[in-house]
């Protein structure tokens, strides 16, 4: 008996070692994530109604108990980005001190903007301002001047500084640890200062990376679902193609073939080219809207709404509607913040990948300030285009969010042309977002490899499209929103820890240490010595210029 016991103990130890090795092997991040997504797809396929019930319970629990956390954490991140941009940390370069950017400013902006917003701008550009115009909260009269102010103020809030700050913070952290500290290009790298040397460091990092992969797939699948719904609506409006699940599956299928083919190529050939094309088409459509729409009105709205937004920045950032209906908050602000958080692993990883060599200040201006201004102009133009048609028209248009854009275009000259351009733009954004996500998913499931295996990119490309189809068939627009909120919650809880970890490293950065040492040396110097030093620096600059 004792021998058998010893053998059993030996077997148990071996099993434990095997399980630990399984967790520590880099490739098993891919297998574990694959298994979880496959299970979710199977559950949706076998029992849609039960899946819908479970997700509703989870959604209500998150909104009721933790809704305020979304607002506080996202505002905190926006303030952190502002501080980093304005402080001495802003001079730190994402890479070695002599690193140079790999991409031109135009290509860099095109890629980060296409990855960060994409389909959402086209989907909600008209629909959101019109919805808030018709259904404002806080006792504001529907269709009034106050409702117009509320509509644009809220749209700016949902698509401006806050979402881009979320992207910027995570991308900044990843780029800093990857290119300056030599860490892997993974979300878990942001936790290195905290977890380094701890007993379960590798296991905890693996769990974080699996959560990041799940959030990315769900977040992108949600956006692909929105894109398919609106492309289908546009084709139905222009060509009377049936607006149903079959058409949406075909659209997703065709787009999947294109973006997977693109993702299997190089970053420069695929995503960069598509991103530049996106920006060109976007500005073309924006230009047409401004010229054919109420041009002066659009610029007046932009100016006034920007002032209102900045004036009420803190107030709207923490608006919870404490004693009112929480439905509005969950359907709009919390949905958006969840969607942005769910997208951060993908967008953050991608932006980090293309931002090597830029300073922190340059990075934040490029990733937060400029895209926010473009979003403000976009919503001013498209929102004014819709609201100018009046409250009664808006009520009809927003009955189906995905068709609102095409109904509004139909009321203006060259409406069919604008609708056609919008469909092309939707498809292009659709492809670019999925293309970028496929690359990042391959990278995250390959231990941060900047050139992940093609078979992984192929599998993730197909899986995110299958999940989009499953969510649409399970509950359409509502299910897409619900899935995004639920999957983003674990990541939301991790964000404050990431803030602490980043500042912990920044304070110990060699660049900051050198600057502090120099300041201390200057403090010890006399005024004459400082004057002499200043003259010497000027002479050196003149010599360098000559």
Give the predicted meaning of each segment.
Residues 1-5, 517-546:
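Long, low-complexity, intrinsically disordered cytosolic termini of multi-pass membrane proteins
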Residues 200, 212-358, 365, 370-392, ...:
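Membrane-embedded translocation segments of transport machinery
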Residues 68, 105, 143-151, 199-210, ...:
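Membrane-interface alpha-helices at helix entry/exit sites of multi-pass transporters
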Residues 31-46, 71-79, 239-265, 284, ...:
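Transmembrane alpha-helical segments of multi-pass small-molecule transport proteins
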